[in-house]
Design a protein with these regions (language model features):
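N-terminal assembly/interaction segments in proteins that build large macromolecular machines
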Residues: 1-202
Length: 202
């Protein structure tokens, strides 16, 4: 019936009724029809920008999963998917975004799982960043609001040093979003521009 179909797919009342009618009451065929139409709708949504989202991670792994609204960013299924992707990276050994997208997640790939949830939720969802390191690492996740999952994440790979210092460095990176790691990396023209600005505003 309609309720059973909605429970199985997360589809709206009208979509579920329409699918059951088209499938002539066949529950499995109705699920298939809803999945096809949902994935088609998800494909149409990919031109909408996913600018909200969350970060998730564990030892040596950090990911960013994007959605269109912070409403979806709070969704338990969305947060759960982010955690599952982190576990998929840990299991597969994927080191970058492309390898992660094709990593197995249940009976599908990570990318297929993201597309499937996008079809259910009705928003463009996208795995946008993946970092995975084997050395000593420190993970810092920051919440912009108490009712939201972490939306800023920093994964620092380091050699030597103490955990307190590394934690402070990670917090500084989260707060300031630095472009360069060391003074030597900063191009001379950038230094000159900053000097001119500082002199003009002094």
């Amino acid at each position: 019936d309609v309720k059973k179909l909605r429970d199985a797919t997360g589809a709206g009342m009208m979509d579920a009724k329409k699918a059951l009618t088209e499938a002539e009451g066949d529950h499995e065929k109705a699920i298939e029809l809803l999945r096809i139409s949902g994935l088609a709708k998800a494909a149409k949504r990919t031109d909408r920008e996913a600018t909200n989202g969350i970060v998730a991670g564990r030892d040596g792994i950090l990911i960013q999963l994007a959605a269109e609204t912070d409403f979806v960013a709070k969704n338990a299924e969305f947060v759960g998917l982010a955690d599952q992707i982190v576990e998929a990276i840990a299991s597969s050994g994927a080191k970058d975004l492309e390898a992660t997208k094709v990593a197995p997640l249940g009976s599908a790939t990570v990318q297929e799982a993201v597309q499937s949830l996008a079809a259910t939720i009705g928003e463009n969802l996208s795995l946008v960043n993946v970092a995975s390191y084997d050395g000593d690492t420190h993970l810092y996740l920051h919440r912009r609001a108490s009712d939201l999952p972490p939306q800023v994440g920093v994964l620092v790979e380091y050699t030597g040093g103490d955990e307190t210092l590394v934690h402070q460095v990670a917090m500084h990176i989260a707060a300031m979003s630095p472009v360069y790691v060391s003074r030597e990396e900063v191009p001379a023209e950038v230094v000159e521009n900053e000097r001119r600005i500082a002199e003009a505003t002094a």
